[in-house]
Amino acid sequence: MEKHSPGDPASVRDMELKVSHCFIAVHDHDEALAFYRDVLGLEVRDDVEYDGMRWVTVGPKAQPDVNIVLEPAAANPNASPQDRKVMSQLLANGMLRAVIFATDDCDATFEQVCQAGAEVLQEPMDHGYGVRDSAFRDPSGNMVRFSQKR
């Protein structure tokens, strides 16, 4: 593969890049779907089984090109058994960061997610950088934040 220098016109910085997929580690696909689809209202984009695995993606209706892959922590086929064990332990301890969703109403979103029984990490609060946000844990222990610009 040819290597390009930073000043080369074919440099990535000159290209228009967009987020397509991001991954959230989960313990169980169905549990994760119950949260991301049923509580947060994300649409299921893919739910396909192949080679004994399951490929599940969800995303916001307003962002059809952005997909969140719900992937078991130990699913990476290139991971060693030790790596899989460590990933599973980090997930169980809530140490894997996840996602921040933008919302028009942080307080209303907070109330809806609370009513669904999600574990609250932070009630809505204003920050000096012009954002009001709140935080929860999803069923797998990932932090999920809801942010509203002020």
Give the residues covered by each predicted segment.
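Vicinal oxygen chelate
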Residues: 2-23, 43-137, 147-150
